[in-house]
């Protein structure tokens, strides 16, 4: 019985965080397109360093903590509202704010195919990591598993952006994902044990890239 529940949770996480899930994540780069344009990321090694820095010290780390808060607060509407508002406040640019809010709205709409009575999400608008955490929490997928799946999907999307911008190929991109498995797992474990008191970022170059992308003339991505 427990094995069946674990398999069901795995299938749900794979589906919810698949590129095929209709949230439109393919259209966002989180400022990576600007970094590529500015030649801050020119190949697979640069891409890995960019992703690892965001995982350890940047927006991806903060998103992990916000997901964990959404997971724990899945049946507490007031706490979910506060978490989502905090996520909005942490968005360092107009485009980052747009990305997290539109992804969150689309995720909640699509996740409606998995309704749950205990999910107390007010309205249909929330920051993306909080929305993912709340839905995963309502369905008891396991917090660390949800974090690992979310972080892996985030890094996978960055690889997809880099491939489409022509700075790495598919083979090198997949190789990077393989090499980052331990890092992703370690960050997921650390985020499970952390709290909102551990929020914080020190990735100023990534923040500036997101801001500069707002005036990038020729672009493939919305952010």
Swiss-Prot record:
Pfam families, per database record: UreF (PF01730)
Source domain of life: Bacteria
Localization (cell): Cytoplasm
Keyword Nucleus annotated: no
Subunit structure of this chain's protein: UreD, UreF and UreG form a complex that acts as a GTP-hydrolysis-dependent molecular chaperone, activating the urease apoprotein by helping to assemble the nickel containing metallocenter of UreC. The UreE protein probably delivers the nickel.
UniProt function note: Required for maturation of urease via the functional incorporation of the urease nickel metallocenter.
Protein's name according to its UniProt entry: Urease accessory protein UreF
Organism: Rhizobium meliloti (strain 1021)
